[in-house]
Each structure stands twice: as C-alpha cells, then as structure tokens.
Amino acid sequence: MPVPIIETCRKRKRKPKVYNLQRFGEDGFPIQRNGAFRDQIRVFLRDCAEIEDYDIRGMTVWCTLLSHETKSSLIPLYIVEENVKHSSEPYCDHCRCTGWSNHFVSKRKYHFIIPIDTEWSLPLEDDAFDSQSHVLHGLIHCNGFGHLVCVNGMESGSKYLCGREIVDFWDRLCNSLGARMITVEDLAKKRSVELRLLYGVAYGHSWFGRWGYKFCCGSFGVTKNEYENAIEALGSLEIDQIEFDFGELRQSKEINQVFRYYREMSEGHLKTFRDLLRFMLIIKSHASPQKLLPVTPPLLTDSPHQKRSSRLLLKKSDVADNDKSPKYRNYSTVAANLGSRWPVRRLIFAAEVIVESLKEMKALKQNGMTRQDVRDSARLHIGDTGLLDYVLKSMNNVVVGDVLVRRYVDPITRILHYTIQDLDDAVKAKEPKKKEAVVLEEITPLRILTPLKPGADVYGDLLLLYTNVLLNYPESELVRSATQAILDSKHFIKEWPIWDNNDTVLQFLCRINPSLVDVRSEQTTELPPGELVTVPLQATVYDLKQAIEETFRDTYCILSNFVVTEIDEVEEDMSLIGSCSALTVRGHGIDLESKLKCQGGCDTWMVKCICRARDDDGERMISCDVCEVWQHTRCCGIDDSDTLPPLFVCSNCCEEFAEQQRKVLQPKYEFPSSENVFLLESADDFFGDQRCLGMIFPEENYLL
C-alpha cells in the first residue's frame, strides 16, 4: 500500500518527509511547542508537510507521511485548511452540539485526515469532510478549539491501526500543536455493546477517559451531576443484591454461574458490579485466542436424532476452496446486525435508493459506477451523506431486492466501483460444478454446538451481564434511569493547560469585554473563550495592545478591524501583571452585523424541551408549527424509526388550543358555586328552566 505514495512523491520531484508514527508529537518531535495553535500549525505545515498538487473545492491540501515501525507501512496524514469566508458551511455543527454556540466564528478550520487503508494512494475526494469511513478525522479551529470527528480502527475496517493507536497519535498531535480544548462524541461500540456504558460503570469514565476526556454536556438535559450519580449507582450495585433481584427469572441461572465463576477466580474479592466488570475486562485484555481460560472448551455433543456416519464425503473443489466461495447475505440481515445509530429501516431504504441508481446505470449499458457517482446519484433522494457513506461501506456481496450488489477496486485507477447482478444469475454462478468426490478416512460424527460455559468466552459473559443487568434489570426504575442517563451522555471534552515553559515571553488570556458584544441569549449564557496572546518580556502596554489587535484580527471574522483602546487590568505598568493572567480588553471596530458572528449561526430558533434541554444537543428534533419552538422527537413520543409528521403542534400549544375550544364550547353561564347560588334544588333546575337563571346568579358571568 505505501509504494504508490512514494512513487507519487518521486514523480513530483520532491523528497517525501516521513515521521515515526509512535514517536510523533513526543518530546518536541517533529516541532517544539512554543505558542498558540494558530502559530504552531503554520510552523508544522511549513516544516513537516508537503503541499499536494490538487485541492479540495479550492482548499489547499498538505500531506505528512507516517511510518509504522511494526507494520512496515507508510500512512498518509492529510491536512486541509478551510477558509471560513469561502466555505459552504461556515458554522460548526460540532460546536453547536457541544455547547459552544456562543464561540466567535474563527477564520480558518484545519482538518486532519487519515483515510481508510484502501484510499491511501488516492487523492482526497471533494466530500472528504463528510465521510465517516476515515481512520481518523479531526477538526481544529484556528483558536485551538476543536473536535475529534471520527475514529475507525481494526473493528471498523482498518488493517494497520487499532483504535487505541489512533487516539494516542491524535492526543500527541493536539498537544504538540497547542490545542486548547477538544471534544468528542463517543459513539464507540464493540459489536452491540456501547462502550461508554460498559467502561463508565467499570472505570467511572468513558473509553476516551483514558486520554483525559471528561463529561462535557449531556443530551436530553442530562447534567454532569446526574451523569456521575448514574455511574456511581450502577457501579455500586452489590453482586449479592443482583442475584436476589433476578430471583427465579429465566436468565438468573446463567447470571449466577458467571458471578460464581469470576468470584472464585478472584478469590472472593469481587463485591460490587464495578469490581466484576473491571476484573472481566482485565482478563479479556490479557486473554489470547490460542490460550483460553482454564475451563471446559465449547461443548460439541452428539445429536441423539442424527445418524452417525463413519465417512464424510467432500468434493475435491470443496477440499481446496471451501473457504473461498463468496457468501451472499440479505442486506436487511446485515443492517440489523450493524448496530448503527440510524434505524434499520433507514439503512434499508438507503440501500434500495443506491440499487435503483445502479439499475438506471445498468439500463444504459454501463458496467457499474464509481463510489462517488453512486453517492452523488443517491444524494438526489437522500440528503444525509453520513448515512450514504455508512451504507456504501457495508454493501458488498449483499442481496437487495432481486439483485446482488458487489464492489471492486479498479486495478489501474484504484477507484472503488459498485455493480449489480440479477440474483438468478448470481446463484447459477455460485453453484459448483460436479466433480469426483474423495473420501476422508477419519470418522467424523455429526455434532451440534451447545452454549459455552462461563469463562470460555469473556466477551460473551460481558455481553450477558450488559444485556440483562444494565439494559433489562427487573423492575428497577433507578437502574433503568441511570443506564439511560449514561447512554444519553455522549459528548466529552479534554482541556490542555496553557503552555508556559518559555521564560523569554509573557502569555496572557485576553477576552473582549462582554458589554461590547451581546452574545448571550436563552440558548447560551457563557461568554466566548479568551485568546492566547504572547509578547516579549520587555513589552510595553502599547506592545501588548498591538499584539492583542493582531491576534484577534487574525483569528475571528467579526474582529478583522478591531482596535484595542483599553485593558481593564493594565493602565501603564506591565510589571503589575504576571504571565498567564486573564485580561479583559475594550475597543471598537467589531462587525456586529456580520453573519459570521457566532458558531450557533444567525437564526433565532429556540429549544425548550420537557427534558430541560435549552440548546441543540445533536439529537433528533422537531419544531412546533405554531410556536416554532424545537423539542426532541423522543420526548414528544415520536420513535427514531418514525417519519416526522407533516404538521406538528407541541403539547403546550395543544393545551392552549384546547382551553380556547373549551371556552367556546362551554355554556354561556358557568356552573354556579356555593357562593353565588341562591336557589338550586337539582341539576334540572339549573339546566332545564331558563326562568330560574335570574334567581341562580346575582349577575351574568360571560366566559368570552
């Protein structure tokens, strides 16, 4: 795989710069950390990367080659500088969903991308920012705030890098470049297990917690305190209490066997559910496929209903190639086992749209379509590019409707293609030819597989406890709500301290006085972050003002003409303030009319959900057609697999409307209370005799 990259470098008459992946970012390698991210990234691109001979929608692309010391491979790291003023998406959805809607729009974004292995020798495509198939995609704004967008290790298709190696590299890269804060949306899964729930209960933090990522904000109104309480509630469950609560339930026998096995292995040191999960994860990390735990292997027992056979007949072709024949799977089955954040129904619909595009091309006598062409055609019907990328990634040797979908890489262009074949033809092609049979002389009784015993498959034991204890605890609202709170906590953040190891300069964290920019609203209450400004030790107040102006003008769109007039904490003497102090500045030249003001955009939408959410958290929402307030579909009783109704009225507007209708439909006179009834012997006296009305009410009470 690395050869084409080197050949490309030779053709461009430049010597490639190659850096060790495992050492990258450590101890000043390849660059020393001396300042803010906006300065560090420029040094990095100048000294450690080479400009590619193509661009993405007019944006410059750099490439740095990384060598893996144990896999003997070269890995390309692409860096793309996105100019916000010329971007089709100037606002940052990741900022908005992590509570940074009030951050000023920065002038530049830097994308760090390691593509999937099969695309290492290919140029980045125009839709590279939207793809979810990259091994690594990180985004950092020029102010040092950024996001880890996606990580796909060996579980997700990478042949060279596991998830831990990828995040290790990203963490060192961020530290070397002087990143301020990085967020991540933790959707990591191990097959069907949500790792943020499993690791949260076992270790008290998410899978990303080992790199210092902590709770940032929860979806559906979950707070940091609720998240921490939920982790403590589940982790502190007593194992004995769990056994008692499951009682005589069908699955209690298996659960008790797992408890007993690992308790005996730990010599009785496991008391709580956290102790048990942590112990099992430690065992799992040290277990090898060749050497299982010292327990009975998977039982293979004879079936009493099968006739024994002393000989097994196999075709010659099967003996040689029984593992090489392709396996066709129905895509509905594949989609159901993917564990995707999209509903299965949407995955199947997207697959059907893709197949229709391939059928249209086949009708024109074209032999297949490139991945990009398929994607572009499907986008006419489905706007969610992330969904399309996810489905395309899983479509190979799958049956959709009456056709078989296959993909292949063109050996010349190295471009991925998709083709379809009628199912009948595919079945005929798969049927083996009749060949002479050979006899295997060994006696092979027919056997069936029975369930594993505890300890034979640690992951299977974890899955048993995860499914039953965490997801289906019997009759416990506490466990159910705690589990849901952890699952609804997806956004985590890591903050790097200000680097102050340079004795030759002074650094200050400078923020504009809030009275100059009204960024507060019902959605956001925190002020935008301060910006790191560096000046020499001998700098004067005038020098500091000049440095602040240059920094703000270079970083934020609305501050291109900003002029500093005053620093609240400094008058004339710089010696009164120390390095790393926070400063508040005043001035003029702020473009308050600019659309590129805050990352939340210039729309005046409002979020006010019954779950207490007051800002966009990235979850599915719907707007009331009357009051235009946004609420979560889940909180409104709309399932994720359901389509949005064409007309939606929230419960508050429904209640107001119902109250108005009730007033309209009520009788003209209210039913009298005991205070204003003069004469009333029965209900018939009130409703049946109009002549009594004058005696019943001292005065008329009109409702409208």
UniProtKB/Swiss-Prot annotation:
Compartments in which it is found: Nucleus
Record's keyword terms, sorted: Meiosis, Metal-binding, Nucleus, Transcription, Transcription regulation, Zinc, Zinc-finger
Molecular function as annotated in GO: DNA binding; euchromatin binding; histone binding; sequence-specific DNA binding; transcription cis-regulatory region binding; zinc ion binding
GO CC entries: euchromatin; nucleus
Gene3D superfamilies found in the cross-reference section: Zinc/RING finger domain, C3HC4 (zinc finger) (3.30.40.10)
Binding-site positions, Zn(2+) 2: 624, 627, 650, 653
Organ and tissue specificity: Expressed in inflorescence, specifically in male meiocytes.
GO biological process: male meiosis chromosome segregation; male meiotic nuclear division; meiotic cell cycle; meiotic chromosome condensation; meiotic spindle organization; pollen sperm cell differentiation; positive regulation of chromosome condensation; positive regulation of gene expression
ZnF start-end (PHD-type): 606-656
Residues binding Zn(2+) 1, per UniProt: 609, 611, 632, 635
Disrupted gene: phenotype observed: Male sterile that lacks pollen and undergoes an aberrant male meiosis resulting in the formation of two uni- to tri-nucleate cells instead of a normal tetrad, accompanied by aberrant chromosomal organization from diplotene followed by metaphase 1 arrest. After, male meiocytes exhibit signs of apoptosis, including defects in chromosome behavior, cytoplasmic shrinkage, and chromatin fragmentation, followed by cell death before cytokinesis. Reduced expression of several condensin genes in meiocytes leading to defective meiotic chromosome condensation in male meiocytes.
InterPro entries on file: Zinc_finger_PHD-type_CS (IPR019786), Znf_FYVE_PHD (IPR011011), Znf_PHD (IPR001965), Znf_PHD-finger (IPR019787), Znf_RING/FYVE/PHD (IPR013083)
Record's subunit section: Interacts with JMJ16 in the nucleus of male meiocytes, especially on pachytene chromosomes.
Function: Probable transcription factor required for chromosome organization and progression during male meiosis (e.g. microsporogenesis). Necessary for fertility and meiotic progressive compaction of prophase I chromosomes to metaphase I bivalents. Together with JMJ16, promotes gene expression in male meiocytes in an H3K9me3-dependent manner, and contributes to meiotic chromosome condensation by triggering some condensin promoters (e.g. CAP-D3 and CAP-H).
Name under which the protein is recorded: PHD finger protein MALE MEIOCYTE DEATH 1
Organism: Arabidopsis thaliana
Upper classification of the organism: Eukaryota, Viridiplantae, Streptophyta, Embryophyta, Tracheophyta
